[in-house]
A protein has these predicted regions:
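Transmembrane-helix exit/juxtamembrane "anchor" motif
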Residues: 69-74, 204-225
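Membrane-interface transmembrane-helix boundary segments in multi-pass integral membrane proteins
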Residues: 11-16, 51, 175-210
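Alpha-helical transmembrane segments in multipass membrane proteins, preferentially the mid-helix core
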Residues: 131-148
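N-terminal helical submodule of small eukaryotic multi-pass membrane proteins
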Residues: 3-105, 109-113
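Membrane-interface loop-to-helix entry segments
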Residues: 121-133, 193-196
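Non-transmembrane, juxtamembrane loop and terminal tail segments
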Residues: 1-9, 220-234
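Non-cytosolic membrane-interface motifs at loop->transmembrane helix junctions
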Residues: 44-52, 81-85, 111-124, 148-153, ...
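Juxtamembrane non-transmembrane "cap" segments at the membrane-aqueous interface
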Residues: 159-177
Length: 234
């Protein structure tokens, strides 16, 4: 199958593409294995570790790279398209998760991490940095340019943000505590602002990733592709 002319490397393929996707899939799978042996109150709580946006993002990353591995092994264009469709949202989401996590942690780790939930550096990097790195490399090196417009990303991100808020409140109604201590400090109005702001960040992240892609792979051509919002993500 011929790669998109703006792709830096051939994908799907059984060479570099397969190597990157296998490494990413192994990293994400290890993170989930870690959760199954990490004994905390979350392990027996309602919602398990899926109360954390980090784990929801990690799930999307795992799905994208599993599809990527299958596409590389079978050279399937359909699986390659499916991987790209998941990655279009998973990649900017993971970038935002990394920025918010490390930024807030630098300011005050107690806003994110309750007592007894402190991670060692290696798993911490695995959850809060590796997914963003792997997915960004997949985009820049192994994917065609995104053609999804910013308003679509904003709409989808807003729906996901408020669906996550509903999910967090549902878990709180069963468990009596929030996954992030920060939520305890916010009023309802402040939470609305937080989740709206987060959806906006995902949109900005998507636009920035498109800009980086254009700079690396061909600015003018990528800009023309970005103005074809109805074109399928290949």
């Amino acid at each position: 199958m011929a790669a998109h002319p703006l792709q830096r490397l051939t994908s799907p393929s059984r060479s570099v593409s397969l190597l990157l996707h296998v490494l990413g899939l192994a990293s994400f799978s290890y993170n989930f294995h870690f959760l199954t042996v990490w004994e905390t109150p979350l392990s027996v709580s309602y919602g398990w570790h899926f109360q954390f946006l980090t784990i929801i993002g990690l799930t999307a990353s795992l799905i994208a790279f599993a599809l990527g591995v299958l596409a590389d092994l079978t050279l399937s264009h359909a699986l390659f398209q499916a991987k790209n469709a998941v990655a279009v949202l998973a990649t900017p989401l993971e970038v935002v998760i990394s920025i918010l996590y490390w930024g807030i942690r630098f300011i005050d780790p107690n806003l994110l991490i309750a007592d007894g939930f402190v991670l060692d550096m290696l798993p911490d990097m695995g959850f809060h940095l590796a997914p963003a790195v792997f997915l960004t490399l997949d985009l820049i090196l192994l994917s065609p340019p995104w053609t999804i417009p910013a308003y679509t990303i904003m709409a989808i991100s807003t729906v996901i943000a408020f669906a996550y808020w509903y999910w967090v409140e549902l878990c709180f109604s069963h468990n009596g505590w929030y996954p992030y201590p920060l939520f305890e400090l916010l009023s309802t109005e402040q939470r609305v602002l937080l989740f709206t702001f987060s959806a906006g960040l995902v949109t900005v992240s998507s636009s920035c990733l498109k800009w980086v892609y254009a700079r690396v792979n061909g600015y003018q051509a990528a800009q023309k592709e970005a103005h074809k919002p109805l074109k399928k993500v290949q």
